[in-house]
C-alpha cells in the first residue's frame, strides 16, 4: 500500500496544493513553522479522519474559508483507489471511490498509517489516556467495527454517568433504567476489553524481538494490558456474569461518586524491561527504545492483519533518536514501507534510505519537489 498523490484545499496553511509521491521515502525539508507537520497531518487525516495534534475540526480550516478538503489516491491490492475527506464547521464528509460513506467507521481502514512523532515518546511515560488513545487509533484502523463499538461504548457511558449523577443528587428517577444501562454497558465493555487485550498480546509478539535486537540482546520487553474487567476462561457469558456481579458490588460507590468506576475508559497498558516497569524505573534511553520497538511492531502487525504494509509518518522524530536508533529505524523500513519524513536538516543522518529519498522543500506554505 502507498499514497500516490494528495490534493489539499484550504487545509491549515495550504490553500491549493497538489503533490505526487514516491512509493518509497519522501522527505519534507524546511525550517520550523513552515508547514511540514501540516503535510503529515493531512496524510493522517486522510487515513484516520483524526489528527495527532488537535481534536478541534475548526483548526484544519484555513482562516475565513468554509471547509477544508483532502483528496488522495492510494495504491492498494493492485488497484488505485481515490479517497476524499471534507471538513466543515458542522463535521466531516468522507468518500471512497467517489461514494459517500455514511459513517466514518466505514471510511477508516482504507489507508493504514503508523505515525512516530516526538510526542509518541510519551506513549511509554505519559498518562494512561495517551495509551488508550493509541489503542483506539491502531485497533480502529485494522478493525473498523472497533470504532463502531467504541462510539457505542462512549454513548452508553455518558448516559450511565448522567444517570449516576442524578442518583447522587437524589433526584427521582426510574431505578430500572440503571440496570438496563449497566446491561448494555457490560456487553460493549467486554467487547472492547477483549479486542484490546488481543491486540496487546499480538503487539508484544512483534515488539519483543525488535526491542531485544535494538538493545543488543540485553533487554526483554513485556507488555501488559491492565484491564479493570477480568476475563477468566473463554466463555463470554461467564465474563458478563462476572462483570455484572462486580458492578453490582460497587453500585453504591458509583452512585456516591456519580461516575462509572470500571471499564475500558479506565484501563492502561504497562511496559516492562527485564521485569521492571519502564514507566517508573526505565531510563530515557529505555523508554525511547520501547517506543521505537512498538512503532516498528505496528508496521508488521498491520501487515499481518490487512495483508498490506502501512504508510509510515516520521514527524521530526529522527532528531530525537541517537545514531544507533536512527540507523535501526531506517534500516527496518528500507525497501518495505512508504515513508514520509519531516526534518529541518538531513546533514546529520547518514543512511542510504534518505540518500535515495524524494525531497520536497517546504517554505511558508509552498512545496517544491527537488
UniProtKB/Swiss-Prot annotation:
Primary localization class, coarse: cytoplasm
Binding site for ATP: 30-37
Biological process (GO), any one: DNA synthesis involved in DNA repair
UniProt signal peptide: none
UniProt keywords, alphabetically: ATP-binding, Cytoplasm, DNA damage, DNA repair, DNA replication, DNA-binding, Nucleotide-binding, SOS response
Molecular function terms from GO: ATP binding; single-stranded DNA binding
CDD domains (UniProt xref): ABC_RecF
SUPFAM superfamilies linked: P-loop containing nucleoside triphosphate hydrolases
PROSITE patterns in the cross-refs: RECF_1, RECF_2
Organism superkingdom: Bacteria
Annotated GO CC locations: cytoplasm
Localization (cell): Cytoplasm
Described purpose of this protein according to its UniProt entry: The RecF protein is involved in DNA metabolism; it is required for DNA replication and normal SOS inducibility. RecF binds preferentially to single-stranded, linear DNA. It also seems to bind ATP.
Family as reported in the entry's similarity comment: Belongs to the RecF family.
Record's protein name: DNA replication and repair protein RecF
Organism: Listeria monocytogenes serovar 1/2a (strain ATCC BAA-679 / EGD-e)
Lineage, broadest ranks: Bacteria, Bacillati, Bacillota, Bacilli, Bacillales
